[in-house]
A protein has these predicted regions:
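Short polar/charged helix/loop
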Residues: 1-184
Length: 184
């Protein structure tokens, strides 16, 4: 759901970016029917979605890696250690972005993310933590998926509002920004 929400919000703001989703478990699985419904409520289409596994190549090409849980960020950092400064859980990224304030137009995304990550250590992501983890709605009711989608939409809004606060321009937003959303 985050891939669709993030891509939709970036499109709405006129930000040119490539957004991909990758997970830890499955390749080729369709989106859960409840995910499809929750996104259809927002006029976002998941009908053609197929899951894919996170790979070193995908991580290497991403300017930002967003995990739904700490374990996703840990696995990304284990697969490719240099991804650590640009890998966050969605909740962590929204929290750190809110604390830091909007990215100035003259500061590249990579530099702004490095500032957000400056005081972190890899041990910060040991174990699970509800303050960082988005509960996985798989196997739950449509109502649970809709509540999850509301939370994700709010968090994505915070992230985009801080990463791309100004009207986009070719100088402020490189068209090759790539964002990877990692889910289980």
């Amino acid at each position: 759901m985050v891939e669709a929400l993030l891509a939709g919000e970036l499109r709405r703001r006129g930000v040119e970016a490539t957004v991909h989703s990758a997970g830890l478990l499955f390749d080729g699985r369709a989106a859960d029917p409840h995910s499809v419904s929750a996104m259809a409520d927002r006029e976002l289409d998941l009908s053609g979605f197929a899951s894919r596994k996170m790979t070193e190549s995908l991580l290497r090409s991403a300017d930002l890696v967003i995990g739904m849980e700490r374990r996703h960020v840990r696995e990304a950092a284990v697969a490719l250690p240099e991804v650590w400064p640009r890998a966050f859980t969605l909740k962590e990224l929204a929290r750190r972005a809110s604390a830091a304030g909007p990215r100035p137009d003259d500061v590249p995304v990579e530099d702004w993310l490095a500032r957000l990550a400056a005081d972190r250590t890899t041990t910060d992501h040991l174990g699970d933590d509800p303050s960082d983890d988005v509960p996985d709605p798989i196997g739950r009711s449509l109502r649970t998926f809709r509540r999850c989608a509301e939370d994700l939409e709010r968090l994505v809004g915070v992230v985009v509002e801080h990463l791309w606060p100004a009207s986009p321009s070719t100088d402020a937003v490189p068209s090759n920004d790539a964002v990877r959303s990692t889910t289980a």
